[in-house]
Amino acid sequence: MAPGIPKPRHQRLVLQCYPDGQAADKKPNPSELSYLLFYVNHRRVKLEKVGPFLENKCYKDVSRGRQGNVMVALDIFAKLIEECHEDLNLFAQNVVNTLLDVVNSGDLLLCQHSNKVFALFCQYHDGGLFLGDPEFVRSFKQLLEVYVNMAKVPNGPNSVQWKIVGLEAAKSIAGSAAIATQTGSTSISPIVHLLLSSLQESQSDLEQLDHSLDLGGGLPDNIGGSKRNSMHQDAIDNFIHEESPEKQVRYLSFHALRTFFDTTSVVQIQSATRAIVTYIINSNVPEHWATSLVVIVAKWAPVQYRFVILVSLVEMLVAMSPNNVKSELVVAALIHALLSSTVNMVGLSVMDILGSLLNKQAAIIKHAQSNNEASGAFEELIDKLSACMISLGTHIYYADQISDMVGEVLWRCTDPATAGQTGHAVSADDGTGLQIKRPTRRVFTTLSANNAELQHSSDESVGAATGGTANGSAGVGSFSHDNSPDVLIRRLAIVEGFFRLQNEEQDMTAHNSVPLSAWDGTQYLLNHDSAIVKEAYVFCFVAFLEYEFGNPDRFQIGFGRRGYNQNVAYGFVSHLSMQLNKLITNTRATNGDFLLGNSLLQNIVIRLQQDGVVATFPHMLKAHELGRALVTGQSSESNTLAQGIIIEDIFTLYLKQVGDVSDAADLTVQAGDEVALRKKLGLWPNYLDWPVSSSSRIQDADAQIDTSMVAKMKTLSRSEVEGLFAEYVTSMPQETRAELFSDYDDVMTIHSRQQVPDENLIVGKARSLKQLNAGSILERQTMRDGWLGDDVKNNKFAEERKGFTPTVSDLKGAMGGNAYVSKEPIAQKFDPQTFLNTWTVTDNLGGLTV
């Protein structure tokens, strides 16, 4: 400006803030600075002039090496930001340009002084300029890049101090609203990589660092609210700056990383999570360190946003190519660590996560089969995914969750030809305490569509960052109905894992029961072509029986006036019993088939008691007639004599079990004596005495049958069996015994029509004796053909209520639901990974012949 021409007032006010002299540690004149702040506070429009003037003066001072004046300019900017932060966008570009000039100067003292201005700028900037000012975005990202590069200075003079400057800036930007925008989030990855690199280089113990910061930021309990949060941050900052420079590097890195996750911005949490995963994949990070890191950062996030971390991990895993096994293993390990932890993830869509992992596992198995890649890495990845899904059972957020998870996996195991008619989800009490569920395929289809859109809109850079593709497998929530043996075996093991895991829970009554109807459509697996699938299916169903009927606190006996529950006896268990009959009477039945069939039969009777007897007896009686005909030489079937002997052995053991559950001690003794005799004669395969579980050696099953002694074997005719029941099983109502010995084809006609309807059922509960007597027991809201058969449906319930006078015990049963008691012990402590490591099935079971 020419001499003699007066300067504008805003320039004079700014210049008056500069003290005289050439000192390196100048500070603004306090009174003049106060007047400048008063001036701009009352005339905010002047900020548009003060900002550029201060920027230009600072640029000249930097170029001329006037360190003291630069510090004054930085202090003035700091005060302007504090006092006029509502209008920060008016001079935000000037602040960023000034900081760029300062950090590019290479002066350590000036760069350290710039940290305060940058921290205030990040604290008060609302991110608005990131939405419509590309020049500002470019400058700001350039500034961030310079700060990040400061922290990467190689070892040398003042390298630790330079690193602290960069880490201080990283901590500041981590808490900024600017980084939480879609545009600003692109800068998260390099900053997070810097922080993790710093932590890994120092070989930091993450849990110890977290604990130390918490102690350093501790406050008295009488301080609360936003004041407490602000004081907590100040206390942590003071704690960090009191440490040695080397410790400051570790604490600053850790605190900055914590700040990235201590936010309500979904975009920021998601971007930071992906950055962590990318770093772990591309760096040689120990697995324990990586898994600990993921669990710790999840605890930092607000509880209602923690699920974003898990969803981000699953999305990255789904997007990876099946060829990228190493990276998939890393992400799967992180998912498993998070699901195995005690981190509470409110709002987590468990079913979508389960569906995504099921699809991914099926895709990996299919890829391995098609490319003949049965490597240990693939097996490890498949096992890890199974462990992830089982661990989902430790995060229970609603009463029907276990039921829904089991139903979802079992639905994927049903025959694809009939899967459209099999559904699950909406619950209705069937009077057993187990719930009948109405099909909800449309609900899951809707969820699939919604999540397909979510998956499509996810960041496409994930695949590139992790060396994968976006179409690695089915998207989140979509269905995969692959019924190959390997897939079926894995899925059945997952369901078994759910039950084993839940058996260790102390308060299982907090979870609703898994309905028997969830198994509808899976009974064909008992006669699957693969012996391993059959084995896995039996293990799985036995685990279900132990879970639902193995805890005395969970269920109580209540069979009603007919001595059994029709929904159990004439429902899925009856259909399963048909398949059991087919399994043991098949001409190609092996020792493994007999072992599995006998184990399944024994568990059904032990757990379901009278209901199990009613459901299985017609089918076992039919099998007994075949076995007796084979033993006596009166059969035209092509089964062998040894098979007939084993069928008879199974039936005799079955009668012994019926005696046990029916309090018919004489029947138990008589059947037990026959068992002892057959063992003595060599007419008893030793494997019928084996307990069967997923750790059994099924392939060791062998039958040393001495067929020459068959003449000494005692067999019972149909009438003799009926006589035994009439004489000994007196606890069973006469009309029920009559049903058991009805013509087999007539019984099957009723059983085959007994299907779960699509309509809702009125819950079979009552709150008073009057209500119970009025007929609230298991009435249907609507009726349709095929429920019980045209000739039965109209009078079935009327017949049951005829002459029925409810008692207090009946009311208790109606209020609580009928159920069962077992004296079997609950499973010991269960670990999903250990279970999967020891869970083995054999591939030569089908080769064992009699």
From Swiss-Prot:
Entry GO CC: plasma membrane
InterPro entries xrefs: ARM-type_fold, EFR3, EFR3_HEAT-like_rpt
GO annotation, biological process: protein localization to plasma membrane
Pfam families: EFR3 (PF21072)
Source superkingdom: Eukaryota
Intrachain disulfide bonds: none
PANTHER family the UniProt entry points to: PROTEIN EFR3
Family: Belongs to the EFR3 family.
Protein name per the record: Protein EFR3
Organism: Yarrowia lipolytica (strain CLIB 122 / E 150)
Name of the gene: EFR3
